[in-house]
């Protein structure tokens, strides 16, 4: 006998459904609860902190069970999704009244971290992406999909570093990868990883899935037909989303290739160090996004973050954005736009739920409210003249047909769900109005019946009532029950009263309940038809949502530029960064002291700045503000400076700070060297490189050697625009030895035992490091500081007396290479070509080498 046959029919049904969804939690609807059994129950009780109970038995052992109330399920789902779990929702689809045996059930949706669309499960100002990754012959295919907007993209990173940068940029909530995926370390420290069968990544299968989704014969029109690795990932991704959503995906209509050469590439370390959307502690406070994002709509906020994480290289597109921001700023239009945009809200995600047919009544009400704001938006934008803004305004024009339909169809304040009706407005459908009138007329009839019966029989305690269990009834107090006429049939006895039914009331009950049932059934039918009526307008509404999002970002950046005194940057193709009175966009907002603005000049004749100065003097802030200003210019934003001319960049690299990578077993120094190696391999003459305190994680001479050699390589072999901060004073000799380098420093002034940081950038090298003064500020005991001063004096005297040459006094040849020079014999051997020597010459060379020993 099969194992399931030992169970009740209900448990047999559960086991069958669980076998179809073995790797995810199954929420099994039983009445007013979703129940979980066996290992699912144990896991859910730990994850959700709910009670673990028992039900029935299996093989002589009680079956573990846990459950959550159906009306509170969204909160529990939100917690599970946050933890990276997926959940299959199994509903009762049969009628308990007519079912023989267990009520029919089926899985109606699968909630996964990357495919959720429910408002309660999403962070409204962050994209919610699902991604798939594929690896072959050292190269990668990577696809991302935002189910809440239909945005579907693929790319093909060529190295692990580039792939890691993409994962950092997109931060997918769920990541699909094949069972034979080799670089598994890319999956570490992230929730929502999903192993998938290898065949789901086959190219032919992928093309078939994608053509089926888009209704096309091939993918040539999308420009992705040659991106084989990316298509393998995209095919797996679309199949997985279809499997989990259990419905059509009409809002996913295209696939775009995300070309790396169109963007300024930021690697994972750069995104982290510049604190673009996440600070070093993992939060969102004091980040660039926190300063710039005052968008009026959640969808605008999400778009701004995408711009920040993917700065552009196309100067024409960036100038269009800058022109648009300038026009809105000059007209002060953002003041009027913001309240109107706020009323429009997050229609992008409402449209996704509409496409998936999971929208709720209040989604429709919000969509109606958004549509009602469009005439006001049209009026406000009528004065705009820039072609980019005019085009956005055209896409955001009112859609009268949709607005009128929703105004006619949906009540002013509909309930949360359609389940109990009350959603469709009066006057929308004549038949529905008639059934409702019949059902609503019950109140008048019951009041009249109660008055008539009370007067006819002289029972002043007589009342007519209704409850869901017993239906309509006539209630009489126990003290007057003797006055009840014979045709009253007792239905229920209470402690102080009796309840009766009479034929007339029973007939009315049948009529009312039938009319309510008919009204509800018709209302649900009309609700489904409403989706069909709206679907032809879906693409137009999605274009509208995109246009409103862009308008929101542009007006937001105009407001930020106006409020924070930003200037318009000049974008040029030639390499170089020229900034007058530049400021750090975040630090200037959070510091209590006046922020000291500083200039920077980088050009082909001044490609590297060696930056010295005291710790806490502002070197890192100066470097970061340069990178952030360049990044802001490359999203088309105004920047915090008096003036700025920014040359086109291909990459921004940062090597700032480090900590142990315990998960990978890498020390601080190893992390530092890995990031340095990435820069030295991948930077180009069009890159901006920030190098801060290279070599501090090892011995003094090793560190100095590495810092010197790295700076020399960047200057002579790569020619990248570089800011090189160092505490090795010896490196200030480099500008004297190599072309196109310069020294700058941040100054400080000592007063006795105290120190004042000036935070102003000056030309030339710093005179000293002020390390002991900073230690005193940090609270190091005065006795320790005093001993340190004594030791410093001794070391300085020792250094002056030493015969060993300092890097600042050795000749140029030695200073350019801190690696030990080859010996005379090694040099002589390297100059000998044995194939060019006769036997006699070879013997003579051997005697000559012997004399060198």
Swiss-Prot record:
Keywords tagged on the record: ATP-binding, DNA damage, DNA repair, DNA-binding, Nucleotide-binding
UniProt xrefs under SUPFAM superfamilies: DNA repair protein MutS, domain I, DNA repair protein MutS, domain II, DNA repair protein MutS, domain III, P-loop containing nucleoside triphosphate hydrolases
Gene Ontology terms describing biological process: mismatch repair
GO CC term, one of those recorded: cytosol
Cystine connections: none
Pfam families xrefs: MutS_I, MutS_II, MutS_III, MutS_IV, MutS_V
Sites where the protein binds ATP: 613-620
An MF annotation (GO) of this entry: ATP-dependent DNA damage sensor activity
Family under the similarity heading: Belongs to the DNA mismatch repair MutS family.
Reported function: This protein is involved in the repair of mismatches in DNA. It is possible that it carries out the mismatch recognition step. This protein has a weak ATPase activity.
Name under which the protein is recorded: DNA mismatch repair protein MutS
Gene name linked to the record: mutS
């Amino acid at each position: 006998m099969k194992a399931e046959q030992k169970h009740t029919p209900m448990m047999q049904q559960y086991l069958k459904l669980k076998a179809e969804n073995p790797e995810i939690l199954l929420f099994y609807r039983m009445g007013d609860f979703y129940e979980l059994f066996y290992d699912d129950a144990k896991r859910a009780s730990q994850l959700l902190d709910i009670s673990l109970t028992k039900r029935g038995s299996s093989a002589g052992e009680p079956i573990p069970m846990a459950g959550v109330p159906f009306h509170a399920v969204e909160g529990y789902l939100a917690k599970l999704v946050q933890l990276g779990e997926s959940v299959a929702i199994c509903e009762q689809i049969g009628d308990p009244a007519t079912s023989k045996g267990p009520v029919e059930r089926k899985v109606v949706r699968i909630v996964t971290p990357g495919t959720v669309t429910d408002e309660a499960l999403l962070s409204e100002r962050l994209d919610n992406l699902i991604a798939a990754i594929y690896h072959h012959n050292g190269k990668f295919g990577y696809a991302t999909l935002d189910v809440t907007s239909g945005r579907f993209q693929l790319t093909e990173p060529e190295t692990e570093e580039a792939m890691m940068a993409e994962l950092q940029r997109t931060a997918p909530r769920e990541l699909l990868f094949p069972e034979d995926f080799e670089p598994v370390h890319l999956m570490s420290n992230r929730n929502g990883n999903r192993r998938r069968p290898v065949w789901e990544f086959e190219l032919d299968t992928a093309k078939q899935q994608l053509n089926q989704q888009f209704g096309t014969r091939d993918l040539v029109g999308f420009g992705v037909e040659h991106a084989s690795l990316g298509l393998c990932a995209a095919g797996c991704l679309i199949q997985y989303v279809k499997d989990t959503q259990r419905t059509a995906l009409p809002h996913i209509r295209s696939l775009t290739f995300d070309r790396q050469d169109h963007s300024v590439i930021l690697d994972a370390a750069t995104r982290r160090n510049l604190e673009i959307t996440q600070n070093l502690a993992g939060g969102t406070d004091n980040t660039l996004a926190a300063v710039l994002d005052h968008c009026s709509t959640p969808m605008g906020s999400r778009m701004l973050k995408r711009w920040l994480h993917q700065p552009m290289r196309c100067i024409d597109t960036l100038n269009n954005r800058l022109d648009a921001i300038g026009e809105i700023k000059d007209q002060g239009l953002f003041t009027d736009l913001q309240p109107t945009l706020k009323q429009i809200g997050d229609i992008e995600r409402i449209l996704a739920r509409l496409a998936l047919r999971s929208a709720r009544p209040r989604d429709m009400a919000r969509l109606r409210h958004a549509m009602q704001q469009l005439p006001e938006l049209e009026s406000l934008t009528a004065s705009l003249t820039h072609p980019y803004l005019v085009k956005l305004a055209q896409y955001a024009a009112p859609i009268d047909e949709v607005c009128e339909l929703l105004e006619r169809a949906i009540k002013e304040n509909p309930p949360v769900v359609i389940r109990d009706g009350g959603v469709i407005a009066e006057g929308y459908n004549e038949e529905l109005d008639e059934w409702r009138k019949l059902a609503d007329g019950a109140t008048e009839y019951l009041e009249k019946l109660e008055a008539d019966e009370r007067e006819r029989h002289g029972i002043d305690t007589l009342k007519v009532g209704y409850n869901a269990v017993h239906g309509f009834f006539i209630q009489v107090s126990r003290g007057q029950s003797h006055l009840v006429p014979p045709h009253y049939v007792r239905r229920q006895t209470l402690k102080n009263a009796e309840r009766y039914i009479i034929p007339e009331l029973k007939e009315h009950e049948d009529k009312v309940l039938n009319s309510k049932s008919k009204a509800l059934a018709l209302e649900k039918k009309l609700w489904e038809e409403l989706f069909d009526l709206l679907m032809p307008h879906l693409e137009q509404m999605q274009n509208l949502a995109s246009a409103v999002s862009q308008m929101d970002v542009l007006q937001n950046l105009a407001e930020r530029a106006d409020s924070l005194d930003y200037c318009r940057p000049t974008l040029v193709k030639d390499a170089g960064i020229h900034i007058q009175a530049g400021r750090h966009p975040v630090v200037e907002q959070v510091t209590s002291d006046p922020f000291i603005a500083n200039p920077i000049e980088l050009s082909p004749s001044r490609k590297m700045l060696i930056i010295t100065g005291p710790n806490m003097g502002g070197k890192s802030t100066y470097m970061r503000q340069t990178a952030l200003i360049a990044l802001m210019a490359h999203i088309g934003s105004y920047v915090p400076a008096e003036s700025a001319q920014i040359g086109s960049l291909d990459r921004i690299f940062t090597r700032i700070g480090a900590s142990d990578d315990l998960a990978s077993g890498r020390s601080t120094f190893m992390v530092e060297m890995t990031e340095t190696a990435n820069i030295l391999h991948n930077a180009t003459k069009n890159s901006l490189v920030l190098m801060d305190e290279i070599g501090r994680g090892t011995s003094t001479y090793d560190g100095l050697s590495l810092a010197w050699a790295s700076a020399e390589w960047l200057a002579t072999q790569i020619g990248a625009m570089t800011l090189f901060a160092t505490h090795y004073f010896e490196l200030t000799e480099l500008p004297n030895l190599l072309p196109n380098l310069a020294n700058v420093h941040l100054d400080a002034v000592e007063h006795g035992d105290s120190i004042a940081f000036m935070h102003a950038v000056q030309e030339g090298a710093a005179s000293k490091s002020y390390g002991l003064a900073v230690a005193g500020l940090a609270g190091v005991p005065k006795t320790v500081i005093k001993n340190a001063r004594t030791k410093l004096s001794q070391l300085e005297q020792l250094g002056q007396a030493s015969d060993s040459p300092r890097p600042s006094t050795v000749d140029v040849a030695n200073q350019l290479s801190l690696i030990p020079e080859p010996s005379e014999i090694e040099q002589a051997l390297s100059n000998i070509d044995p194939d060019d020597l006769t036997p006699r010459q070879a013997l003579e060379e051997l005697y000559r080498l012997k004399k060198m020993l």
